[in-house]
């Protein structure tokens, strides 16, 4: 569906939720928002949640809307996993909270941003909750595609498919936000329509410089030795970025938790030590996911490079994404064939799939880099 159709479906659902005389089929207790990264599936789910608990049907200005979007409303729970999976214990606790009566609204709304990361046991536990819904509970699940959730869950939710906005639309949005046309056009092309990624590239000189370094690493491969060297450089960069982010967040989280458990000196009240161990476990899982997410983003950037090579090989230069590397791209295009370029793109996509299935990062990237030489 296009965005206009999705908005209309959600508007009808909000209207039906506020007026029992309207078509009851427009509103249901469980929804699945699907779409590729950058399609806005999570933003759409959160906006829908805000509209459901808004006294005005989603004005975007009231305290209910603002707190729901900020993730601080008592009747809207946003589940954002920073680990590799969502486990059954987390879902059991969530189901218990979801059954509580709304505090100030008509509904208690639960948004699960990464429903595709549910373990099988967690998904089965969630299925039971969806099969036996509370009168005032609404479940909003988000995933890349409908096939990323259990078939039994798919059959019990209403699915909405969102599409990635066009590059031109994203560039126009960035210009309206105050970025120059040059930066907006580049960021939109480089992000291939992913609004969040495009905004990040537009804002950050460091991000643009890091992206250029990644592409130059891919261009530097000439033999097996350089392939292994490039793989190590990419994985080391991912680990370094994850460590920087972890250091920034971990100590503050531990300090806040110790204060919450009443630590004085080296002593914690009963249960505090267990809570700290659980936090440290979650922080380790988050760091692992950050490494994989960084690598996945880097591989997507490298895909754009070989996409450009393929365009040049096909006789077209108008839609090149990495125009600042045109000379290097033309050199690669002249020395290779379209068939080999397609093989390289396939190797990158296989590596992305393997990383998503928890393959060892260094071995995965090494295998890919060897095929890019």
Walk through the language-model features, giving the residues of each.
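Charged, glycine-rich active-site and insertion segments that engage polyanionic ligands
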Residues: 1-50, 67, 135-137, 144-298, ...
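Conserved D-loop beta-strand region of ABC ATPase nucleotide-binding domains
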Residues: 110, 140-143
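Short capping loops/turns at secondary-structure boundaries
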Residues: 84, 116-119, 142, 146, ...
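Conserved phosphate-interacting/catalytic interface
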Residues: 302
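Conserved catalytic/switch belt of AAA+ P-loop NTPases
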Residues: 99, 124-141, 151
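Clamp-loader machinery-focused feature within the broader ASCE/P-loop NTPase space
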Residues: 1-121, 128-131
